Amino acid sequence: MQDLPVTLQLGLIGDNIAASRSPLLHKIAGEQNGMDVSYLRLVPREMEQDFDGVFQYAKDNGYRGINVTYPYKEYVTKFLEVEDPLVRGIGACNTVIFGEGMPKGHNTDYSGFMSAYRNVRGNLAPGAVLMIGTGGVGRAIAFGLVGLGCKELRLVDRDMLKAEALAADVRKTAPDVKVVCGSNAEALADGAQGI
């Protein structure tokens, strides 16, 4: 195997990530693209630092980017420039790119959902959608649906406070989208074109 010419330093900040397969995934992806990738698990308590210290460490020590996972995806946003207004609406980032200026924040749950949808449905906007679950990934999917042109979103969750909070955030970011919340999926499914 020939020497790989580019070294790319990446990492994952989170708690309870010892079993993460991300280091291997990124190493293989790097090899497939002619890059030597180093991807380290950065666990604040193991590094005897808080999140702020670990984030600054990555920023100051040549990391090109980091992934951020539980419980830091919402907290990290205060350190980031988030260009996409829908990602700002989500209120959580799981990918950070370091470069000139402020670190840039992204949410790959959101962008990945939108990409997968477009691969299957093209530019066809979703109709009325019933979405069950309004947790972290549910928030990203809801804003992805808005980005795809959804005009009616029906949110179902056992935790109505969480569903109402998401509904309020969607309405604030996209006031033209009709958002309804409830706990009865069967009733809200009537007339829905997607679940």
Indicate residue ranges for each PLM-predicted region.
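Short SAM/SAH-binding signature in class I
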Residues: 130, 193-195
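Glycine-rich adenosine-cofactor-binding loop
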Residues: 14, 107, 117-118, 125-150, ...
